């Protein structure tokens, strides 16, 4: 059975305004009778043992599984800056191992000006291999999050290529339903409208068999149903590959609706799917 988790970034604006803490976000997940939480690395107040234990116990006492730590890296950088990105991933793999969290989210590369996807690709593969090998040594899976906004991999084919090029059992795939090229939620083209040049539902189909976690993106939920993404089309794709794992609710419609109103609506909608 697919299980629902709350991505802590659903409360991005509330958190940034100092009106909620990660521990209080965990309380919200329990209040909405969700099954787990995804914890963004910027929401940790500390990496001291006492604080990490407090977070772990808060989830345990509320019956919530800690699905993954989301880290925002960029393997498109070079030199010392690239080494810093690799070290950032290793730091949070260590945190995950200390907390018993099975996975850490990774991005690919934001391709620098003057480079092509192909010229940046070998650097992406080599950096990711280092991180995946480190994850393997710690017993923590590194989950590739497909992303657009100038980032690769941005298509289903690119995701499969990178997974195969890295070729490590501790390197897997976190499928984001709204972040493939052509999605109404991406930055290229007119936001809110599907780009017909790209078959983003096809990208979801391509990478779904490799997914160990799905991020269900929510952009417009004021009506009680997601308006930009067609979940009547997406959910059969996910279910038909036998997916039986975790699905995060990830709200990114703060320009339309406030987070305290939107998150319970998104939870109810995804449960209806």
For each of these PLM feature ranges, what is it?
Residues 1-103, 119, 129, 136, ...:
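N-terminal pre-domain/capping segments
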Residues 6, 29, 37, 59, ...:
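Conserved, mostly hydrophobic/aromatic
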Residues 10-12, 41-43, 72-75, 108-112, ...:
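Active-site-proximal loop/turn and secondary-structure-junction residues that shape catalytic pockets
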Residues 36-37, 69, 130-236:
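Acidic/histidine-rich catalytic cores of soluble enzymes
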Residues 64, 101-102, 140, 241-245:
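A short helix->loop->beta-strand "cap" motif at the edges of active sites that frequently abuts
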Residues 96-117, 138-148:
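Active-site groove signature of glycoside hydrolases
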Residues 114-128:
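Active-site cleft segment of glycoside hydrolase catalytic domains centered on the general acid/base Glu
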Residues 246-254:
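Short acidic/histidine-rich active-site segments
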């Amino acid at each position: 059975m697919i299980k629902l988790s709350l991505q802590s970034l659903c409360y991005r604006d509330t958190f940034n305004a100092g009106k909620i803490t990660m521990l209080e976000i965990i309380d919200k997940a329990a209040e909405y009778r969700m099954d787990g939480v995804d914890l963004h690395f910027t929401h940790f107040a500390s990496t001291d043992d006492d604080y990490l234990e407090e977070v772990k116990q808060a989830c345990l006492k509320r019956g919530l599984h800690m699905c993954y730590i989301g880290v925002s890296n960029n393997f498109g950088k070079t030199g010392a800056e690239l080494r810093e990105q690799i070290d950032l991933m290793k730091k949070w793999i260590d945190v995950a191992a200390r907390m018993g969290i099975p996975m850490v989210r990774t991005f690919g590369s934001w391709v620098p000006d003057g480079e092509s996807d192909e010229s940046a690709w070998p650097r992406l593969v080599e950096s990711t291999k280092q991180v995946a090998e480190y994850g393997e040594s710690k017993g923590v899976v590194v989950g590739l999050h497909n992303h657009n906004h100038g980032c690769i991999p941005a298509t289903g084919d690119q995701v499969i290529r990178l997974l195969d090029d890295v070729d490590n059992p501790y390197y897997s795939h976190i499928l984001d339903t709204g972040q493939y090229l052509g999605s109404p939620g991406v930055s290229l083209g007119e936001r809110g409208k599907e780009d017909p040049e790209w078959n983003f539902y096809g990208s979801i189909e391509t990478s779904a068999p490799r997914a160990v976690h799905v991020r269900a993106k929510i952009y417009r939920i004021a009506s009680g149903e997601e308006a930009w993404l067609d979940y009547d089309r997406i959910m059969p794709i996910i279910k038909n590959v036998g997916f039986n794992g975790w699905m995060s609710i990830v709200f990114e419609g703060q320009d339309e609706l406030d987070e305290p109103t939107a998150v319970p609506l998104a939870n109810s909608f995804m449960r209806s799917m």
